[in-house]
A protein has these predicted regions:
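Glycine-rich, positively charged N-terminal anion/phosphate-binding segment
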Residues: 15-90
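Active-site beta-loop-alpha junctions enriched in small/polar residues
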Residues: 15-17, 40-42, 70-72, 97-99, ...
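Alpha/beta catalytic cores of nucleotide-metabolism and tRNA/nucleoside-modifying enzymes
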Residues: 6, 10, 16, 22, ...
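Alpha/beta enzyme core
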Residues: 29, 78-112, 116-195, 209, ...
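Hydrophobic faces of well-ordered beta-strands that scaffold small-molecule active sites
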Residues: 10-14, 35-37, 65-69, 92, ...
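N-terminal small/glycine-rich loop or linker at the start of catalytic domains
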Residues: 2-11, 43-64, 98-106, 126-135, ...
Length: 334
């Protein structure tokens, strides 16, 4: 990305409410080529909102780190970029893909896919206010009648974007099953900057298929890695032609979960961190016996010691099902 060399071709995409510093560090430790902050409002940055600035917190994790900003006014996006230049990060990412109603209703996120010219002007302003590389995360388009990823990607490249990540669904599709790899291939053919393919990558074969079908330069993994940071190890090995790594046993998975939540509590305090940890914790229940009941348990987490009780329940459920938690093959990822 510009002057940044990535250690791996699989990177961790931004997700509001999930990609805080502890989550990013965990993914980087397991091989994410870069990580990105939760999306940050350009207006809030310009107005100096302290809560928003806290989302930028960087933790040394061995991988390049980007700050993602969102907004629909080019000049404000430029001012916001200037406001964060003082912080420690490696690149600026522009959100042109968020489908959330509260974001698109203001004209930002994936609503920008309706206006390629505005996309270009936003990138131009951001590039003008930073010495760091600028990247863009976008969608296939707004809806079936507005498939604009190619036009938007070309406008962004011309304005100075150093990389484009394409989620292969329209805003109308949200996260419904099925992606369109062809749109990623079309963007790859249309621009010279690196292109990342994004959407429905849950295993190494998904990543290989995306690269094979689209010739993209790398893959961006987001939801698929929640509760499964080892996905980066498996994908990296596959993309680099290396043997598949050994999967973690249940103890390793629970150790990772506990450390992640511990860091959340250390950084935010129990009152803020534990409600946020409920959603993170649910993802670690994937593939386990008794997962439905365990996920309900996740919804009650209030104190850090509640997590220890949950982890004890996880092991008990596996034993009741006749499984050996120490045998990695008995508790595989789905």
């Amino acid at each position: 990305i510009g002057n940044i060399t990535l250690p791996h071709r699989a990177v961790f995409g931004p997700m509001a409410g999930f990609t805080d510093a502890p989550c990013r560090r965990l993914m980087a430790q397991h091989g994410a080529g870069f990580t990105v902050s939760e999306m940050v409002s350009s207006r809030a940055l310009v107005y100096g909102d302290h809560k928003t600035v806290s989302l930028l917190k960087a933790e040394p994790n061995g991988a390049p780190y980007g700050v993602q900003i969102f907004g629909e006014v080019p000049e404000i996006m430029g001012e916001a970029t200037a406001a964060i230049e003082q912080y420690a990060f490696d690149f600026v990412d522009i959100n042109m893909g968020c489908p959330a109603p509260k974001i698109v209703s203001g004209g930002a996120g994936s609503k920008l896919m309706l206006d390629p010219d505005r996309c270009g002007r936003i990138v131009e302003q951001v590039v003008a206010h930073t010495k760091r590389p600028v990247t863009v995360k976008m969608r296939k388009g707004w809806d079936a009648d507005h498939i604009t990823a190619v036009e938007c990607a070309k406008a962004c490249e011309q304005a100075g974007a150093a990389l484009v990540a394409v989620h292969a669904r329209t805003r109308e599709q949200m996260y419904t099953p099925g992606i369109d790899p062809e749109i990623i291939a079309r963007v790859k053919d249309a621009v010279k900057v690196p292109v990342l393919g994004n959407g429905d990558i849950h295993c190494a074969e998904d990543a290989l298929r995306m690269v094979r079908q689209t010739h993209c330069d790398g893959v961006m993994i987001a939801r698929g890695a929640l509760g499964d940071p080892w996905l980066f190890e498996r994908v990296n090995a596959a993309l680099e032609g290396l043997p598949a790594p050994k999967e973690p046993n249940l103890q390793a998975r629970m150790n990772a979960l506990r450390r992640q939540v511990e860091e959340m509590v250390e950084q935010k305090g129990e009152f803020v961190a534990m409600p946020q940890a409920r959603a993170q914790t649910m993802h670690y229940m994937k593939g386990l016996k008794g997962a439905a009941a365990l996920r309900r348990y996740c919804c009650t987490l209030t104190h850090l010691e509640d997590l220890d009780e949950l982890i004890a329940a996880v092991f008990e459920e596996q034993r009741k099902a006749g499984l050996d938690p120490d045998d990695v093959r008995e508790v595989p990822f789905p």
